Amino acid sequence: HDKNTATAFADTVRDLPRTPGRRTSVSSALEIGSLLIEASEKDIVATRKVIDVSGDGPNNDGNPMMETHDRIVAQGIIVNGLPIMDDNANGYYPDLDRYYAGCVVGGRGAFVVVVRKYADYAAGMRHKLILEISQNESLIKEASTAKKPLLTKIAAGPAAGPAAQPEVLRPTNGYPGGCDIQNGFGGFRRF
């Protein structure tokens, strides 16, 4: 697609209404992402399949997290994460980065980009996209030689926002409090 399509999509996402709530279903996001990838495979041959998960809370609704995670990763899908850890937010989780590393991300080359303030989200997303693209050398070469201006501009442009280099974590094996959180605002308890 072209720059106008990307800009229109970004505008649509930016203009979506925010709905504060106490429920987060990371497992449902993974399931929907997997279904969308599966549906697109009729028309597109992908060299990599990646689901990006951004959020400010753990899985406290929907199906069990690790069961869903393991099924998605077994399909060859990479899951990367961008936890938003703003300590001024309602329902702040001080170790959400470790939760994402232990329960959300997975697959070959998976990673977590940590954002510490909502204001730094755009910079974190940009950093994450560059990491995802740069993990595939042929894609970088194609972007620069095929004159795909949007990808080239993103990769070459200056850092957006104050957080130029967000913290990046690799996957770990589980989370001490469990990956399914009941009553997320009341504490980390297994279902």
Residues of each region from the PLM?
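Active-site-proximal beta-strand/loop segments in catalytic clefts of secreted hydrolases
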Residues: 1, 54-57, 82-85, 115-118
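Von Willebrand factor
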Residues: 2-48, 81-96, 124
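Sec-exported extracytoplasmic/periplasmic mature domains
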Residues: 14, 18, 34-42, 59, ...
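DG-centered beta-turn motif at the end of beta-strands
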Residues: 33, 47-62, 104
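VWA/integrin I-like adhesion module and closely mimicked acidic/polar interface patches used
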Residues: 57-102
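Von Willebrand factor A/integrin I-like adhesion domains
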Residues: 84-140
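A cross-kingdom marker for long, charged
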Residues: 113, 124-191
